[in-house]
Amino acid sequence: MKKHILFLLCLIAVSSTRAQVFADHFADKTLRVDYIFNGNASGQAICLDGLSALPTWAGRKHHLAELPLQGNGQIIMRNAASGKTIYTTSFSSLFQEWLETDEAQNVTKGFENTFLLPYPLQPVEIEITLLDPRRNVRASMKHIVHPNDVLIEQKGNSHITPHKYLLHNDSPEKCINVAILAEGYTLQEMQTFYEDADIACKSIFDHEPFKSMKKRFNVVAVASPSTDSGVSVPRLNEWKHTAFGSHFSTFYSDRYLTTSRVKAIHDALAGIPYEHIIILANTEEYGGGGIYNSYTLTTAHHPMFRPVVVHEFGHSFGGLADEYFYDNDVMTDTYPLDIEPWEQNISTQVDFAAKWKDML
């Protein structure tokens, strides 16, 4: 695991000397693209839900057309005139996990998904693809974005959520930018949130390879307020009004804590430079969740808070898989045994040598 995340860090956080290539194609701001992934186990589709612009770009400015990981889905941005790939990224989604549940056999649902892309200078074609566990295409769509489109909503220029930096090493373009959001904290509880966010930050940087590369990161705590204190626990019939509507019992797994309100997460972050997201839930219940290039969400007041936030960040930041089995995990049987998983910390031994042989 350490070797894999170190590789990702080196790929993302290199010197900005190659950034001039970025300026050939992109402005120093963000194109936020909202999609709805919908369907059921029999068929899936992708719908464009909205476009908006954010005032800064906090992602990578090098290796723009390279994928460090395959993920369960991919986005390719091409220059519309030449067809040249100018940016690509990968991700996983809660929707794809849901497709493995029994419910997906009989019910059609839609899930919000939001992605941050560098803002193009010229018209671009964006292609987004969802893959199944065998790496076959489940759903795909293409659409053209004109950067001067007057209907691209401008966000992040006002009404910015209160925030403060826990770790600020350099400007956003020279660091990996992590935002920690409050979930289930009222306005009166924000001091507690800042203390919890500081614990989360310190817990992550207590571990390698983050510890050695701490100076490559900025971490900001964002005080997104909730009406109610705490988060929803369906098995106890407790339902709260919170900033992001998070709840336990996702897919009927008691400790799986997620939110489907992805657009609300990104709205709360508009105007703050960010790339990776951690959400802290104000609860003593045990649980959490982490989705690659989407978010980490974890309980903040359970005794296992520190190791859990590190574990879940491994999912969302590093694309790592769980290395253990537990009952009612919908992902347990999703890995075909004749295909090597893209996650770097597990193996079916189909291509074991490429991953770990040099470590033995």
Predicted ranges, named:
Residues 25-151:
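Beta-strand-enriched, solvent-exposed domains that form extended recognition/catalytic surfaces
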Residues 4-13:
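Sec-dependent N-terminal signal peptides
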Residues 313-329:
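Catalytic Zn2+-binding segment of zinc metalloproteases
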Residues 190-193, 288-312:
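Short pre-active-site segment immediately N-terminal to the catalytic Zn-binding motif
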Residues 15-19:
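Sec/Tat signal peptide C-region and signal peptidase I cleavage site
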Residues 216-292:
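Active-site-proximal segments of metallohydrolase catalytic domains
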Residues 150-211, 221-231, 250:
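Fold-level signature of zinc-dependent metallopeptidase catalytic domains
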